[in-house]
Amino acid sequence: MKPTSVIIMDTHPIIRMSIEVLLQKNSELQIVLKTDDYRITIDYLRTRPVDLIIMDIDLPGTDGFTFLKRIKQIQSTVKVLFLSSKSECFYAGRAIQAGANGFVSKCNDQNDIFHAVQMILSGYTFFPSETLNYIKSNKCSTNSSTVTVLSNREVTILRYLVSGLSNKEIADKLLLSNKTVSAHKSNIYGKLGLHSIVELIDYAKLYELI
């Protein structure tokens, strides 16, 4: 039987290696690519079929949600499992909205990743019950009226801004023009009703975006 092909995408080599070792418990899985470069993944997808992509929501040059749309344009049947160490409430909710097949917090037991892969490849989705309950909680309801007004691109830029990157550095990372980044920055401040980087940092901490 043909092995199930898997791509692992994460910015940290040690995490990519750890996931690969974890998945070796299932001899039917074949890791065909490990990378943090979305362009390499796109090139691979254009020439070979892939069954599953396991990827961190935070990737150099893009965000996972934007990249998911790109993936589906190339291979509509590929399944996607998101990983993140950031706010489970916020990112798991967006993962569901984006059409991902699963979400696992990096703060959880690593075996959750293996279990999620097994579930997804069996035709199910994997969003742990505690995650779904967290999304439905009052905290997330409060969150939804504010953070969710931002687009995925704006969330990515917000996180770069509060980490201290300049407009030019953000533009270089996301392959955008300075003008486009400035426009996104203005939209972020306008949508959130904020006026300074200090307020933006406090906001990001409040909603666990950093």
Curated annotation (Swiss-Prot):
UniProt GO molecular function: DNA binding
Subcellular location: Cytoplasm
Domain named Response regulatory: residues: 5-121
PROSITE patterns: HTH_LUXR_1, HTH_LUXR_2, RESPONSE_REGULATORY
One GO biological process term: regulation of DNA-templated transcription
Cystine residue pairs: none
Key words, A-Z: Cytoplasm, DNA-binding, Phosphoprotein, Transcription, Transcription regulation, Two-component regulatory system
DNA-binding region: 167-186
Domain HTH luxR-type residue range list: 143-208
GO cellular component, one term: cytoplasm
PANTHER family linked to this entry: NITRATE_NITRITE RESPONSE REGULATOR PROTEIN NARP (PTHR43214:SF41), TWO-COMPONENT RESPONSE REGULATOR (PTHR43214)
NCBIfam families named among the record's database cross-references: PRK09935.1
Protein name (Swiss-Prot/TrEMBL): Fimbriae Z protein
Organism in which the protein naturally occurs: Escherichia coli (strain K12)
